[in-house]
Amino acid sequence: VLTLEKPSKFAPIKLPKADGSDIFPRVWSKVMGWGVTSYPNGKPSNELQSVDVRVWGDNACENKLGVDKSSLCAGGEAGKDSCVGDTGDPLIKENGRGDADDILLGLSGWGTGCGDKDMPSVYSRVSAGIEWINSVIKK
């Protein structure tokens, strides 16, 4: 969470509901970042990249990678993933009604490789920390 010296001219992204109801299995989302574009020998991108990935169900994510509900999994399609250098970058659910309606689902965390078939990346679930986030931004 950042505190700006002056108000931004850009509207902030919507935050998810605390109950996690914005996240459901197989929903399309978009991950963006400047990480490497090929793994393992790629270089960080000079331009912002994005790719559409599907969110996994909680049980499938836990069974595959042993994570709890403070995390979520997305991806698993060959060649489409976040990668090295993308940590902290956004996972966004686009609702199709313009940027003002998009929801921040997660922040890129970790994975085993990049863009491997049937192997998702793990994201910090924003809704898991939403009460804390809201308490900080209201100050």
Curated annotation (Swiss-Prot):
GO terms for biological process: proteolysis. It is found in: Secreted. Keywords: Disulfide bond, Secreted, Virulence. PROSITE patterns: TRYPSIN_DOM. Secreted effector that suppresses host plant glucan elicitor-mediated defense responses. Targets host endoglucanases and inhibits the endoglucanase-mediated release of elicitor-active glucan oligosaccharides from P.sojae cell walls. This is Glucanase inhibitor protein 3. One of its GO terms (molecular function) is serine-type endopeptidase activity. Disulfide bonds join 61-73, 83-114. One of its GO terms (cellular component) is extracellular region. Residues 1-138 form the Peptidase S1 domain. Belongs to the peptidase S1 family. It comes from the Eukaryota. Pfam families: Trypsin (PF00089).
